[in-house]
Swiss-Prot record:
The lineage of its organism: Eukaryota, Metazoa, Chordata, Craniata, Vertebrata. The keyword RNA-binding applies. The gene is Msi1. RNA binding protein that regulates the expression of target mRNAs at the translation level. Regulates expression of the NOTCH1 antagonist NUMB. Binds RNA containing the sequence 5'-GUUAGUUAGUUAGUU-3' and other sequences containing the pattern 5'-[GA]U(1-3)AGU-3'. May play a role in the proliferation and maintenance of stem cells in the central nervous system. Expressed in stem and progenitor cells in the subventricular zone of the hippocampus (at protein level). Detected throughout the hippocampus. Detected in astrocytes, ependymal cells and in the anterior subventricular zone. Detected in proliferating cells. This is RNA-binding protein Musashi homolog 1. CDD domains: RRM1_MSI, RRM2_MSI. The modification Phosphoserine is found at residue 191.
Amino acid sequence: METDAPQPGLASPDSPHDPCKMFIGGLSWQTTQEGLREYFGQFGEVKECLVMRDPLTKRSRGFGFVTFMDQAGVDKVLAQSRHELDSKTIDPKVAFPRRAQPKMVTRTKKIFVGGLSVNTTVEDVKHYFEQFGKVDDAMLMFDKTTNRHRGFGFVTFESEDIVEKVCEIHFHEINNKMVECKKAQPKEVMSPTGSARGRSRVMPYGMDAFMLGIGMLGYPGFQATTYASRSYTGLAPGYTYQFPEFRVERTPLPSAPVLPELTAIPLTAYGPMAAAAAAAAVVRGTGSHPWTMAPPPGSTPSRTGGFLGTTSPGPMAELYGAANQDSGVSSYISAASPAPSTGFGHSLGGPLIATAFTNGYH
């Protein structure tokens, strides 16, 4: 007889793996615990049987668990290619306990600093943050190819209280440039499914605040938050073009022909919307397409690898921290920061190196 007692079928995060326990998916809504036990009893002695039900409606959720007295029952079930119960094909599998989901770090000694200007050095960063408390370490992430930093880094303080004080002021001014400071988060928090290991997009903190534009760097176990795309206004807001081999060219389009004047019937005769649409379609005099993204005088030239100008958020979905890097750097990841406003740019092909403040610990 089924009861309304708490259902222990879903293992707690710390539950050890039981090789005799099976997950049974695809159950019919009519399948009962007794029916489930009776069916799997033909494969071995059943120690425990459970059909998972909605706590409010008490309806079956379409799956359950069966635990055998020994592993031989599990082996017999798996040896049979097809199982059918209550006129429905079911899917028995070995059950594994759920892993504990990592929690967001609220107390840490490490912060991520993004948006540093090109002329900012690691000593400048350390000197600035020393006003809040003792700095144990400061680091900027560098490109090996150009030997220039990419506009962001990490600072480690003596205590968590200093970090709280720093992060209360979200934006700080270093070398006449506003930079953003955030608590560094373990990469497991930002990508609990392990997508940070590859090129999958990681969407930390929700889509409303942070979109795409993720540059993955190697820094042991931490990932900082990403920035919304702030590329050229002619592009779709919130998006960047993240193809490393794709070159974004801003080339004027061929001159458009001047359309003849339509005077036979007033455009307003078709309604205001039709008149507005027709007027927008007529290009007069200049001979250029109104959507052409011609570079303004003195602007930064186009870049390869998804870098879209000086207001771009930085590296786009490129994986850094390769195996040939320092082992102390390669196991952490961080996200892109806004490119410095001075207009320098780097290719994204080269690996990164880190420069650290020498403080007797390195």
